[in-house]
Amino acid sequence: RHPDRNFSKNFDDVVPSAAISYGLSEMSNIRVGYNMRLNRPGIWFLNPFRISATPNDVSYGNPDLSTEKSHSISLSYNIFTSKVNLNADARYSFVNNGVTGYSFVDEDGVRNSTYGNYVRTQRTSLSVWMSWNITDKTSFMLSASGSYVDLRSKELGSSNSGFGGNLYAQLQQRLPWKLDFTAYGGYGAPYISLQGRSGSYNFYGLSLNRSFLKEDRMEVSLFASDFFSAWKKYSSTTVTDTYRQTSHYKDYACRFGVSLSWRLGSMNVNVKRTER
């Protein structure tokens, strides 16, 4: 009845990986590894049915898409102590058949949006994760990453490159009267795509928690987030040979609230020890 909705697709892939780890001490090690990751397109990427949002705008999937294969080579360092846990990872990855969404204007002036295995991507990145017990009552956590990405497509005649990354930090403090205070914040750099980029973003928040009743079964939390700038503004830009599109939108991000959680039941764990 609707032949343009009928399609089938099978994927068969081999996924190799290898790693070598060397202990520098009882609490630290380095690791070199290679792995391949798969990104199989979902049904919305494959479905060829044409959806017309407006007379001049149509979108559809591509049933000929193949599995996107990402190859990655990494070098990581780990150290674990009573005060600090640290992981640092340097990585180079590449994709030769990346799935991308792209748009073009046809002879009738209609903008077509679909997908193809048209992108070659190279990415170099460095990431760090750290957990630091500053005192018995104070802890700090940091997660940060930075990368440079280069995207190219001969089929579409497009290329783009740039720096990206994100940052998240969290401070926890144990206060008198069984109160736990948490402050957190984060930042995300613009996301780079083949035909454009999105804007950056940031967020932050505070929370105050306290447990009640026997075995701390009930927890009450007061929280607030993004209270200095209630409205967050975002933007994204798409550039092709035939048109340029810039979108602006905003979201009400400010939040204040109270939450209550109650733990039911109990779990007792007995660990059997073996004496040598």
Regions found by a protein language model. Name each.
Residues R1-S28:
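Signature of Gram-negative outer-membrane beta-barrel scaffolds
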Residues K9, E26, L38-N87, F94, ...:
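Outer-membrane beta-barrel signature, preferentially recognizing the C-terminal barrel domain
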Residues M27-I30, K83-L86, D136-F140, W177-T182, ...:
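Repeated loop/turn-to-beta-strand initiation elements of outer-membrane beta-barrel proteins
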Residues Y60-N62, S66, T81, N85-S143, ...:
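Outer membrane beta-barrel strand-and-loop segments of large Gram-negative receptors
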Residues H2-F7, D57-P63, V110-N117, R152-G157, ...:
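Extracellular loop and loop/strand-boundary signature of outer-membrane beta-barrel proteins
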Residues V32-M36, Y77, A88-F94, L142-Y148, ...:
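Transmembrane beta-barrel strands of outer-membrane/channel proteins
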